[in-house]
């Protein structure tokens, strides 16, 4: 029974990648809208977009790490 709960926890941890995909889409769409409104700030906004993408992707990289920890490190007693 605990092995099934462990698998469910690992599966739930991987759902964070869906949230990261939504977040990256929001960052990029906001960047496109901002450049469309003010093209003279395109270089500065590109830097902010890359920063937002990197922070969102960093949060997404924790999801597989947690899934692996749940699956392989935590022992069922």
From Swiss-Prot:
Topological type in the membrane: Multi-pass membrane protein
GO molecular function, one term: ATP binding
Key words, A-Z: ATP-binding, CF(0), Hydrogen ion transport, Ion transport, Lipid-binding, Membrane, Mitochondrion, Nucleotide-binding, Transmembrane, Transmembrane helix, Transport
Residues marked Reversibly protonated during proton transport (site): 57
GO biological process per UniProt: proton motive force-driven ATP synthesis
Keyword Metal-binding among UniProt keywords: no
Gene Ontology cellular component terms for the protein in this record: mitochondrial membrane; proton-transporting ATP synthase complex; proton-transporting two-sector ATPase complex, proton-transporting domain
Subcellular location: Mitochondrion membrane
Spans traversing the lipid bilayer: 8-28, 45-72
Similarity field: Belongs to the ATPase C chain family.
Binding partners and assembly: F-type ATPases have 2 components, CF(1) - the catalytic core - and CF(0) - the membrane proton channel. CF(1) has five subunits: alpha(3), beta(3), gamma(1), delta(1), epsilon(1). CF(0) has three main subunits: a, b and c.
Main function: This protein is one of the chains of the nonenzymatic membrane component (F0) of mitochondrial ATPase.
Designated name of the protein: ATP synthase subunit 9, mitochondrial
Primary gene name: ATP9
């Amino acid at each position: 029974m605990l092995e099934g709960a462990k698998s469910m926890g690992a599966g739930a941890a991987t759902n964070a990648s869906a949230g990261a995909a939504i977040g990256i889409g929001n960052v990029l769409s906001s960047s496109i809208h901002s450049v469309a409104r003010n093209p003279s700030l395109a270089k500065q906004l590109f830097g902010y977009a890359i920063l937002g993408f990197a922070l969102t992707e960093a949060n997404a990289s924790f999801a597989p790490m947690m899934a692996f920890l749940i699956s392989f490190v935590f022992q069922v007693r």
